[in-house]
């Protein structure tokens, strides 16, 4: 019965935790800072930022991202783009673009993964602050000012991660991911911030202190998700990571089931790889914030495999002719589904209220997707089942290369 209670109440507990954490974070830490009151005249003596753009087969998007960074008002900046052995014409597009624009270009012949590309690019960085961007990202003009301001206020920061938004919302998958980033990912980052440690920066858009990256050994070339891996290394070296919701960027998301599935399996595998690698170092830190973060990861994996075992047991022992058994099972399923959906609608409403501060949404068009957080748990379970065995088989010391990304329908 205790196991059944865990199966039923763990997702409900986590959703409530995210709701309460998001509300508290918003009113205590987020709302007092009005994003419309950024006075750029106060930032005349700004710190320089080196923008790193690592790309692989990004011929359709890289020019937009370069144009976005070049057009930023931020006065002290340099741009370093790294082509990681692309098999398409990405390099040719960059060389052609460079004829009329000033930036550094590192053209690697062999694809050895994003982490290796970033490690090569940072060697060319002149400034102490390094902004890492994906090659499909368009940045809000105010974002670098907000992020550099956070570093000035807190010398313990090793990284400030921004608030990614979705560019391609024309498809149902695009709309669903818009909901996910607002009602789940945004809520998780706010709640984890209150606990004192964020599980991962957003690899698509984060500002690092270069000296902090040097201390932790930069990015790990053998980890499938370099952003999660470097986040935990920063925590273990006593650096803090801040979530800056005012720093906006717009990115492209997968718009095919296959592309989305590959992305989520990779994310989950990366989280599991880090958990396996950093379990004992985390235990030795005796830091409550990291214990909470690690417990959340372990509990989620445990929940998935208990669900799998429980469902398998039910299938093996079920008697389809036993009316009482079927009625009981259906009533429990109905109760848990109704409760979870009700809580997730609350979570969606809270997230929509908070998120409207940064991006106006078509509420009528999105309300019917408020059921998605419930489906999120089902998708997460399937992804974990696929990803955890992959993490166990990680090859240490190699290169975690990347494949051509699914960028969906580019909307200019």
From Swiss-Prot:
Q: Any transmembrane segments, and where? A: 7-28, 298-320, 332-354, 364-386
What keywords is this UniProt entry annotated with? Answer: Cell membrane, Glycosyltransferase, Membrane, Transferase, Transmembrane, Transmembrane helix
Instruction: Classify the main location.
Output: membrane
Q: What GO CC annotations are associated with the protein? A: plasma membrane
Tell me what topology the record assigns in the membrane.
Answer: Multi-pass membrane protein
Q: Which GO terms describe its molecular function?
A: acetylglucosaminyltransferase activity
| Compartment(s) where it occurs, according to its Swiss-Prot or TrEMBL record | Cell membrane
Q: Provide a GO biological process annotation.
A: cell adhesion involved in biofilm formation
Q: What is its EC number?
A: 2.4.1.-
Q: Any phenotype upon disruption?
A: Complete loss of the intercellular adhesion phenotype.
Q: Which family does it belong to?
A: Belongs to the glycosyltransferase 2 family.
Function, in words:
N-acetylglucosaminyltransferase that catalyzes the polymerization of single monomer units of UDP-N-acetylglucosamine to produce the linear homomer poly-beta-1,6-N-acetyl-D-glucosamine (PNAG, also referred to as PIA), a biofilm adhesin polysaccharide. Requires IcaD for full activity.
PANTHER family in alphabetical order = POLY-BETA-1,6-N-ACETYL-D-GLUCOSAMINE SYNTHASE
Q: What is this protein called?
A: Poly-beta-1,6-N-acetyl-D-glucosamine synthase
The species this protein was found in: Staphylococcus epidermidis (strain ATCC 35984 / DSM 28319 / BCRC 17069 / CCUG 31568 / BM 3577 / RP62A)
């Amino acid at each position: 019965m205790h196991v059944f209670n865990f199966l039923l109440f763990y997702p409900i507990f986590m959703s409530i935790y995210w709701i309460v954490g998001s509300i508290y974070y918003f009113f205590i830490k987020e709302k007092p800072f009005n994003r419309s009151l950024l006075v750029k005249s106060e930032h005349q003596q700004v710190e320089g930022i080196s923008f790193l753009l690592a790309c692989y087969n990004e011929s359709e998007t890289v020019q937009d991202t370069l144009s976005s960074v070049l057009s930023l008002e931020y006065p002290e900046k340099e741009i370093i783009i790294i082509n990681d052995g692309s098999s398409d014409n990405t390099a040719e597009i960059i060389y052609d673009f460079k004829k009329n624009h000033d930036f550094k270009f590192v053209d690697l012949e062999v694809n050895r993964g994003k982490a290796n590309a970033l490690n090569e690019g940072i060697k060319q960085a002149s400034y102490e602050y390094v902004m890492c961007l994906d090659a499909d990202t368009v940045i809000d003009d105010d974002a670098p000012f907000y992020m550099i301001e956070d570093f000035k206020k807190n010398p313990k920061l090793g990284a400030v991660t921004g608030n990614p938004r979705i560019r391609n919302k024309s498809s149902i998958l695009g709309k669903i991911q818009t909901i996910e980033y607002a009602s789940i990912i945004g809520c998780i980052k706010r709640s984890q911030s209150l606990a004192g440690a964020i599980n991962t920066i957003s690899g698509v858009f984060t500002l690092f202190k270069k000296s902090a990256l040097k201390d932790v050994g930069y990015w790990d070339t053998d980890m499938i998700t370099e952003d999660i891996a470097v986040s935990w290394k920063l925590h273990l070296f006593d650096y803090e990571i801040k979530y800056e919701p005012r720093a906006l960027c717009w990115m492209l998301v997968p718009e095919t089931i296959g592309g989305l599935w590959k992305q989520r399996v990779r994310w989950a595998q990366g989280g599991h790889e880090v958990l396996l690698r950093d379990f004992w170092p985390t235990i030795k830190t005796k830091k409550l914030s990291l214990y909470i973060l690690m417990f959340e990861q372990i509990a989620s994996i445990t929940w998935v495999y208990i669900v799998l075992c429980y469902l398998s047991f039910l299938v093996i022992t079920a008697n389809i002719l036993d009316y009482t058994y079927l009625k009981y099972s259906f009533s429990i399923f109905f109760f848990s589904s109704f409760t979870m959906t009700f809580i997730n609608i609350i979570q969606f409403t809270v997230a929509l209220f908070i998120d409207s501060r940064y991006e106006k949404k078509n509420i009528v068009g999105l309300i019917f997707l408020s059921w998605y957080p419930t489906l999120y748990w089902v998708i997460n379970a399937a992804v974990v089942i696929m990803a955890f065995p992959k993490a166990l088989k990680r090859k240490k010391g190699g290169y975690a290369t990347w494949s051509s990304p699914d960028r969906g329908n580019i909307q200019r």
